[in-house]
């Protein structure tokens, strides 16, 4: 189910009968202020607390907290990630960090999932997930979805985890080209 996360009443209606909430919000990079992640998280947390739903899994990003010492990341990622997170993606990543704070400050059973750069694959692969540094620069949306569903039925114990696709990933240059030539 879905709702406009800026609308607290719509979020409350969706959450009311849920066993768990999976939040996979996303907005394009912009230089304008962004509040979709943080406001959405605040509305989701409030709705969950008022309806008694306790399990929350939210999608964040490895870019929210770049790890310059990430030895498993390709050189191109270590080169471009700081540029993206401090320029064209700054307002998005600032709001993602606020979202993580809202989630962490809640009394819910939460897990924050930080995928690497997202790309499309029509199938699930053997991905790496958990409290480890991602071994790759990318995460397929299929792998992310598979992991989110698995996490929905587990207790989170306030975990922040990563997920990374290890097979059939694009190169950094293929990803840059894809993003640069996306149709608007």
Where are these predicted regions, by residue range?
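Alpha/beta-hydrolase-fold catalytic nucleophile elbow
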Residues: 24, 59-60
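NAD(P)H-binding glycine-rich loop region in Rossmannoid oxidoreductase-like domains
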Residues: 1-43, 47-50
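Oxidoreductase cofactor-interface core, primarily capturing Rossmann-like NAD(P)-dependent enzymes
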Residues: 7-8, 31-32, 49-55, 62-184
């Amino acid at each position: 189910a879905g709702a406009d996360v800026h609308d607290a009443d719509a979020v409350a209606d969706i959450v009311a009968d849920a066993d768990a909430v999976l939040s996979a919000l996303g907005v394009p990079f912009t230089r304008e202020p962004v509040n979709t992640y943080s406001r959405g998280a605040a509305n989701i947390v409030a709705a969950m607390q008022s309806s008694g739903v306790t399990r929350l899994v939210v999608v964040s990003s490895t870019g929210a907290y770049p790890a310059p010492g990430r030895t498993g990341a390709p050189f191109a990622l270590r080169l471009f990630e700081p540029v993206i997170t401090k320029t064209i993606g700054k307002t998005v990543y600032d709001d993602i960090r606020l979202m993580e704070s809202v989630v962490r400050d809640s009394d819910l059973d939460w897990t924050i999932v930080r995928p690497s750069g997202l790309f499309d694959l029509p199938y699930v692969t053997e991905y790496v997930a958990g409290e480890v540094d991602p071994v790759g620069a990318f995460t397929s949306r299929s792998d992310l979805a598979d992991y989110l569903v698995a996490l929905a039925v587990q207790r989170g114990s306030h975990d922040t985890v990563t997920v990374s696709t290890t097979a059939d990933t694009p190169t950094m240059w293929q990803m840059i080209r894809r993003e640069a030539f996306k149709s608007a």
